[in-house]
Amino acid sequence: MASKVVFFAAALMAAMVAISGAQLSESEMRFRDRQCQREVQDSPLDACRQVLDRQLTGRERFQPMFRRPGALGLRMQCCQQLQDVSRECRCAAIRRMVRSYEESMPMPLEQGWSSSSSEYYGGEGSSSEQGYYGEGSSEEGYYGEQQQQPGMTRVRLTRARQYAAQLPSMCRVEPQQCSIFAAGQY
């Protein structure tokens, strides 16, 4: 009987140690998350965002490296900005940069609906009145503002995420790849 009590007490003590260790890990994780959040806010990765934009808009792909004005310097700045962010927070910083880039992209007027309100402007080419989507060139949106073709935004967002996921590899920093599709991260 005494051995059962000793065994039970030892098991209870081990469980308490495990629980306190888990609580410590949880509080350490919260601290690290807050620290990362601050670090990510302080490091917007502006040069990386410009590299991403140049890559996606084609301003960088069709010129030889030596003819790209500032492209090499911009990549070096991007790599330096990535190195300035701690290893643990790099992927979160890249995710935030991509999210910021996505939020700045104009949304297409798909199927004639305005992305900012519930007003209907007519489908692509459905009206000859001025100001409708599809009037003139396929790049003009309502009242002539620049818009992307329907579906192009989704493709561009996917490419942005794929390219951004490879930035650490391009800069030779750890981790070599980041999951840009992770939700709920800064």
Curated annotation (Swiss-Prot):
PANTHER family, per the entry: 19 KDA GLOBULIN (PTHR34481:SF9), TRYPSIN/FACTOR XIIA INHIBITOR-RELATED (PTHR34481)
Disulfide-bonded cysteines: none
Major location category of this protein: secreted
One Gene Ontology term of the molecular function aspect: IgE binding
UniProt signal peptide: 1-22
SMART domains per UniProt: AAI (SM00499)
CDD domains: AAI_SS (cd00261)
Functional summary from the UniProt entry: Seed storage protein.
GO CC terms, sorted: extracellular region
Originating organism: Oryza sativa subsp. japonica
Lineage, broadest ranks: Eukaryota, Viridiplantae, Streptophyta, Embryophyta, Tracheophyta
UniProt-recorded name of the protein: 19 kDa globulin
Region (Disordered): 108-155
Similarity comment: family membership: Belongs to the 2S seed storage albumins family.
